Amino acid sequence: MFAVRCARRAFPLVVLSLALLGSTCGSVASADMSSPSPGDPATQADLVRDLPDSSTIEQAIVDALTATSLPPQPARLAVPGDDRAGCTTDYLETSALGCVHGDPNGTRTVVLWGDSHVWMWLPAFDAIGRDAQTQIVEFSKSSCGPQDMRIWLERLRRAYKECDDFNRFVAGRIEAMRPDVVVLTGGVKGVRLVEGDHGTAQGVEDAWAAGMASTIRAVAPFAGQTIVLGDIAYPAPEPADCLSAHANDPHACDTPRSGAVDENGNPAGVFDDHNQREQQVAEQNGARYVSVTRWLCRDNVCPAVIGGLAVYRDYFHISPNYAYWLSNALGTATGLLR
């Protein structure tokens, strides 16, 4: 069905120690090839079903909040390598390959549409797709969420017209593909609207709500179901530097859920007002909304380490290992694992 597919890397068994996570926050430490290859669909299915469910993750957060030390043993998870090369659309590009993850021969098709948060969640969706015999088709573009709104890109110091063009391209692909499910996701932190020759944060929430509603309505006739995947909690300290500097303090790198500010002076934690409004917009327009903050925070705290894993890759993304660890819970919450 899909003529263009990017080359995919095999799934190694990745061994990640907390010491390494402190310095690289989610990169590969070493590979243990004595274990069965997670690239085999049957093996991957078993691995996903063995990962924690939502209640187990929530209990792990409770445990993290009361921890007196960081785990001394490395965490072992089968996670994908970095598949962004040739798949995630760069700033000046306006089309995408539509890379296929999950089960390339799957009988169902799920489209992921959004900014770098699409790539962030790929370890989970790839595993879900393999388990559920589902093709996961990626349409992602750097700093370009799926909502229909005109944004400013500070990197280019101008209106991000390439984002507008890219989103029109993806909408056309969805119309042609008629997928079973479309998942929309994007990070709101740092988003700015165009105001003359500069960007402004004023009015972002209204524009985001209207733009998300417009996108949902646009894809509804061509998708069996539309899911809006909610935003994450954003860390206040820089994850890698903080974990490296505070290896003996399990809570030095935690972030308050509300009222937090990162080291660059930007808001951090959970943007509850934004999430609540996005959920309302999604549900009012017939989409399913899936919140992810329950897997990141508890009692007004968002730990930096949960279940022995560094939660964050950087200021804007959770780590590949943590995303993969959420595969079972995310697959259940979205209804993609049955």
What are the language-model segments listed below?
Residues 2-338:
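Extracellular/periplasmic envelope-modification machinery, especially enzymes
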